[in-house]
């Protein structure tokens, strides 16, 4: 039984069965991760552990698809730096790039993002 010490009017100083009440502190995963799942998730989380990459991913998610040439200004980073960060996110499976002329257009790999959300319990 998962126990949460919730504060406030509802349960001041009471112990609440989280599973029964559906309240705070849910576990991140329903079952232990296998070795391959843990390694894959660690790669993704490592890629997201950088604030620039996290911002970059949020920009791509909000735009649905964006040219790498349009990432420099909002990130405040040079083209080589943007390329480095998009490569890391691409290698982690979060971004998919398509070369169009001299630029790469980026979009989020929705299936991979869904896998990550599921692994984290979301």
Spell out what each predicted region is.
Residues 53, 84-85:
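Histidine-centered divalent metal-coordination motifs
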Residues 72-73, 84, 90-91:
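Alpha-helical residues within the helix-turn-helix
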Residues 65, 88, 93-94:
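Short hinge/loop at the helix->beta-strand junction immediately C-terminal to the helix-turn-helix recognition helix
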Residues 35-78, 100, 104-112:
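N-terminal helix-turn-helix DNA-binding core of bacterial DNA-binding proteins
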Residues 1-48, 92-94, 114-115, 119-120:
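N-terminal leader segment of winged-helix/HTH proteins
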Residues 2-3, 76, 81-82:
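Intrinsic low-complexity/disordered segments
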């Amino acid at each position: 039984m998962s126990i949460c010490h919730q504060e406030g009017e509802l349960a001041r100083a009471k112990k609440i069965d989280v599973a029964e009440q559906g309240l705070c502190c849910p576990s991140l995963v329903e079952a232990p991760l296998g070795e391959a799942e843990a390694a894959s998730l660690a790669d993704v989380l490592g890629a997201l552990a950088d604030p620039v990459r996290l911002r970059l991913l949020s920009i791509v998610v909000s735009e649905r698809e964006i040219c790498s040439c349009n990432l420099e200004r909002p990130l405040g980073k040079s083209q080589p730096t943007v390329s480095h960060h998009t490569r890391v996110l691409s290698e982690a499976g979060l971004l998919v790039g398509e070369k169009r002329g001299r630029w790469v257009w980026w979009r989020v790999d929705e299936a991979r993002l869904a896998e990550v959300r599921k692994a984290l319990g979301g």
